[in-house]
Amino acid sequence: MRLRKKWWARPEMEASNLTIINPSLFKGKWKDEFKNDGEIYLELGCGRGKFLCTQALNNKHINYIGIDLKDEVLIYALKKVVEAEAENIRIIPMNISKIENVFDRDEVGRIYINFCNPWPKRRQKKRRLTHTGFLNIYKKFLKPKSEVWFKTDDRGLFEESQEYFVESGFSIDYITYDLHDSGFTDNVVTEYEEKFTNLGMKTMFLIARIV
């Protein structure tokens, strides 16, 4: 579905000190931005921010950064962060393909990828956020033995992503084809997940760790 342009979104985001407009300036300096030594976790494709805010409020000792491309979506994530008074969140409006310019070696402790675009056509697969090209970039700034938590409702993407992780030097430490019937207790539900689980969608989930 095409999002209607919200011309007011970018000025409102730029006016907030929770939005990082030039993130490359913070490479290697994110702990200075948060003013603490807590771990930094990323959500790639954070959407409207429910997952991000819930995680941050439940884990105030951890710093969270949500990244997404569309201002029309991110403005709602920002509003949630402000309403929640979650000081341990920053929002970055950015194409994730540029992420290598934003984080330095060993600067990030975990990545969450929730229901990303499956890019099913062969010529599009390199755009997948779990593709080996992206995974090898993430490894440049993830700490040793860090984890990537990945959720999707697309079986093809899920099964091919397992191959991507192994090829890129990750072990798969946990996997389920039906997260909500798995007994896994640390799941935080996204807006998309909540809506479509109620319609019968099964969520596939894995935790991959750098070997």
From Swiss-Prot:
Gene3D superfamilies: Vaccinia Virus protein VP39. InterPro entries: SAM-dependent_MTases_sf, tRNA_(Gua-N-7)_MeTrfase_Trmb, tRNA_methyltr_TrmB_bact. Pfam families: Methyltransf_4. The keyword Signal does not apply. It catalyses: guanosine(46) in tRNA + S-adenosyl-L-methionine = N(7)-methylguanosine(46) in tRNA + S-adenosyl-L-homocysteine. GO terms for cellular component: tRNA methyltransferase complex. It is an enzyme of class 2 (transferase). This is tRNA (guanine-N(7)-)-methyltransferase.
